[in-house]
């Protein structure tokens, strides 16, 4: 894991591992330091680096800018230089055939998220996921990458872990499984159902459970669940084997007005099955009309919506995970 006592270097490393397009490089005085260069190489570019390496195309782009910045920072070449390890790593990447940008966007790659709010002792809490960084996959699903609302809801739960600790959780629209892994690995939930309406997304969840050491855990259960479809079939007496659900989580599941009626129908059925259940939704306000449509639909079906005071931190304030700060993300508790 990222091991650097310098905040600038650590921040750069965590941003890189999250495959951020805009990186906060350490200042020149640090970059020209031999020890800092070696730390960056060992943490990010060495074949035996402690986290899975990002795609070759991304590594090469960052290495080019990094070495250029180091070169610009050097005032005395008798005293400082560019690490041979960094130059060798770049030369190897230059010699490799690389996929096109379009091809690279569809490939699944490792993305590591640093959980700064859970920092403690020598442990560097993090979640590594296999993701497709394109906005929409070739199959049409949006669930193969982690969206900002999941990261923001994860931060909210990290400082309010009592909401899920020792609880049985159902996540709607789990996507890459970020929240499910967070709850099961770090927040002390007793069980998480990681549900999604896409069969492809549910099938790929096993990869991300494996990467995070949860492949043999009975704390996470992937499930295909389509909103608006009856939870109880004609041959079932109890849904989910009659096991209770305490909390429902959903991040970025109100993205389109067309899905809202089916979502509300599923929430109604869950409330009927589990009276008193807690429902926590994180909604990204890309379009004010869509968000207001969701609020109106909740009101018509008897749900009260209580917004939480948990604004998106500015980019400068973020220490990991990193996400856009220009669009509001509303965290709401629903009750009926």
Swiss-Prot record:
GO biological process, one term: methylation
Main subcellular location of this protein, as a coarse class: cytoplasm
Enzyme class: transferase
Location of this chain's protein in the cell: Cytoplasm
CDD domains: AdoMet_MTases
UniProt: S-adenosyl-L-methionine binding residues: 147, 173-175, 196, 232, 251
Signal peptide: none
Similarity section: Belongs to the class I-like SAM-binding methyltransferase superfamily. EEF2KMT family.
Function: S-adenosyl-L-methionine-dependent protein-lysine N-methyltransferase that methylates elongation factor 2.
Protein's recorded name: Protein-lysine N-methyltransferase EFM3
């Amino acid at each position: 894991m990222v091991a650097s006592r310098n905040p600038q270097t650590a921040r750069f490393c965590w941003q890189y591992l999250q495959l951020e397009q805009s990186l906060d490089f350490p200042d020149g005085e640090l970059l020209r330091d031999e020890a800092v260069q070696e730390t960056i190489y060992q943490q990010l570019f060495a074949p035996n680096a402690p986290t899975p390496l990002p795609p070759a195309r991304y590594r090469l782009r960052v290495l080019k800018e990094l070495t250029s910045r180091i070169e610009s920072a050097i005032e005395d070449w008798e005293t400082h230089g560019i690490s041979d390890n960094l130059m060798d790593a770049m030369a190897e990447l230059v010699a490799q055939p690389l996929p096109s940008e379009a091809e690279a966007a569809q490939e699944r790659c490792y993305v590591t998220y640093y959980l700064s709010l859970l920092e403690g002792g020598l442990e560097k809490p993090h979640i590594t996921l296999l993701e497709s960084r394109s906005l929409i996959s070739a199959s049409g699903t949006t669930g193969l990458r982690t969206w900002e609302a999941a990261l923001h809801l994860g931060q909210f739960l990290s400082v309010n872990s009592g909401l899920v600790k020792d609880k049985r959780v159902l996540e709607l629209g789990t996507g890459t499984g970020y929240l499910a892994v967070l709850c099961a690995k770090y927040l002390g939930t007793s069980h998480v159902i990681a549900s999604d309406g896409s069969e492809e997304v549910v099938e790929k969840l096993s990869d991300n459970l494996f990467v995070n050491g949860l492949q043999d855990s009975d704390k996470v259960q992937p499930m295909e669940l389509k909103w608006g479809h009856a939870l109880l079939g004609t041959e079932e007496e109890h849904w989910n084997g009659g096991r209770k659900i305490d909390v429902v989580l959903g991040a970025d599941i109100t993205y389109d007005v067309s899905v809202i009626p089916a979502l509300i129908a599923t929430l109604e059925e869950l409330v009927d099955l589990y009276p008193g259940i807690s429902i926590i939704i994180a909604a990204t306000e890309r379009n004010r009309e869509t968000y207001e449509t969701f609020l109106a639909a909740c009101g018509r079906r008897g749900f009260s919506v209580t917004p939480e005071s948990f604004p998106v931190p500015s980019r400068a304030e973020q220490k990991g995970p990193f996400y856009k700060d220009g669009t509001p993300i509303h965290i709401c508790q629903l009750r009926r």
